Structures are given as C-alpha cells and as structure tokens.
C-alpha cells in the first residue's frame, strides 16, 4: 500500500496532463477501498480543485464505494468511476479470495445510482473457458458501462 499523494502534487500532474493534450485525468489508489475518512475527503478536495481550476475531466478508481461516497465524488465533479468485475461470475471465486462478486456489483450499483459514468471490464486469459468469456461479456452488457477495459 502506498501513501496518498498530496493535493498539490496531484493537481500539478493533472495540469501537466492537460498541458500535453489529455482530456481526462484518473485518480487511482491501491487496495480494496479508501480506509480512512480523511483520505476520502482529501480525494474529494483533489477532484474539486482540478475541476474548478482546469478544463480536464476527472475519473477515479478507488476500490469499493458506498452510495454516500459515490455521491460525494459526483458532487465534487467526478465524471467517471472505474470498477472492474474482473471475470465471469462463475470464475471469480477462483481468482479472488478477499471478497465476492456481489461486493463488486454493490459498488457498481452505487456508482450508477450516484449518476457517475461507469467504466467496467476485466481480464481475459486467467484460465477461463470460452463459455465463461461469453458469460463475462453478457454480464458486462447488463451492467451498461460507458467504457469497457479488457
């Protein structure tokens, strides 16, 4: 686990991204979720500062979110949230032992309920069958993400 960067450092990086032509800037953390309320508040301030001062859109991938957290991010100017389902539901228990597929879906529901765009995909090539690849794609279709990273 890495410490969260300072607001000014993230802002400088977003400004640089905009300067070289990026239209989007994504704030990403490691771990299952943001553990400390103060860290979450700091991320909200990052989003707000970038959106108020720059012309770049802000996205994030921070792990599991409650509805309240998703709404707070949206209220501070976040556009899109990335939360991958990773694989077909039937394969998921074999690739992840820290949480279940329903935990992933709960965050996705919260993201959509807050009015954020959803970025949701997964990884191909983890030993899944052709049927599991199809299952994964059909599951993604039902989630209606704005973009799908594979």
Residue ranges of model-derived segments:
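Short alpha-helical scaffold segments that flank and stabilize functional sites
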Residues: 16-20, 86, 107-114
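Short Fe-S-cluster ligation motifs
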Residues: 9-29
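Short glycine-enriched, charge-decorated loop/helix-capping segments at active-site entrances
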Residues: 2-4, 94-99
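Canonical radical SAM enzyme core domain
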Residues: 2-12, 34-80, 85-89, 103, ...
